[in-house]
């Protein structure tokens, strides 16, 4: 699908983009190893992915500036203290909630952390007025963040920000990419080495996790990238998931940083407020969901007997940032008891908040309850003796272990 009204702008900037990308690649190839740890040389980066900031009101904007961004800043400072590897921030779209006048202020707030800030455009980042063509609807975003489709290199990965929201004059939208974007992607792929990892960053998901398939509009992207390792980084869904379709094709759906649309401090799938951290070390990726205000090693949330509705006789644990490569085991009084039982359930903390603490108009309360759904990143165990000592150990796909004791 061609949008001829944008072709002139696209062509004028093509040469500049290509030059910037080639300079970035040259810098990558010439980069001297950085010293890290006890004399060990490592190369890489830290990318803090922020899902759908989406402030709609001035109060939400202040909360983003005064509560959430300072906690992200603490993560930036921890990375700086660990090494001199570069750190950047990526916003997965819906930078605002139809309040495009907030865009410059949100960008400035994130830039105050002193690291590069990249973004993709979301459906709520358009100036939503009826009978407004897509180019005009995108103008506030483009004036703030630059072109919708950009490329930048970090470590041994090339990142491509893609606009996959096609906006209609009647204020509706659908998900897709146009043929010019695919041409642009093909040009980028001809310029980068075959062994360079590719990360395509878009707002709406590229896969259907429940079917284990790539959405039809994203299939040409997969074909163009070819045999390279490809990661999609997306938002929009307001929940966390990692879809591993093959060893070289993974999607990371990043949960909303503010919880459930600012109305709950937890996303409806049980993911606490937080960011998604991608760390590249010597060409290899590792990642985790980082809860705001918590340490990087805090990944387990535990409910004792009687605290989780529907599982009152069990100890229940939630794995934050779970995917299907996790292993969760337990021991009782020092005796290994094997794998914990995986269960699907609504998040106990989310439901407690909705039923006991949330106080909004009925329309919002109904939305909070309706959005809650059962997820499978929960595990449970039942003691064989009362007051026994329990140890829960969870191991992620990278071999990192996380332990809690009761």
Q: How would you label these PLM feature ranges?
A:
Residues 249-333, 371, 376-405:
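Binuclear metal-dependent phosphoesterase catalytic core
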Residues 100-194, 213-233, 237-281, 285:
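Extended active-site neighborhood of metal-dependent phosphoesterases/phosphodiesterases
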Residues 8-23:
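Bacterial N-terminal signal peptides that target proteins for export
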Residues 52, 93-94, 122-123, 203, ...:
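Active-site glycine-centered loops adjacent to acidic/histidine catalytic or metal-binding residues
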Residues 348-381:
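Aromatic sugar-binding surface patches on proteins
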Residues 33-104, 386-391:
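N-terminal active-site segment of His-dependent metallophosphoesterases
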Residues 24-30:
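Bacterial N-terminal signal peptides
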Residues 92, 189-209:
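Short acidic, glycine-rich surface-loop motifs adjacent to enzyme active sites
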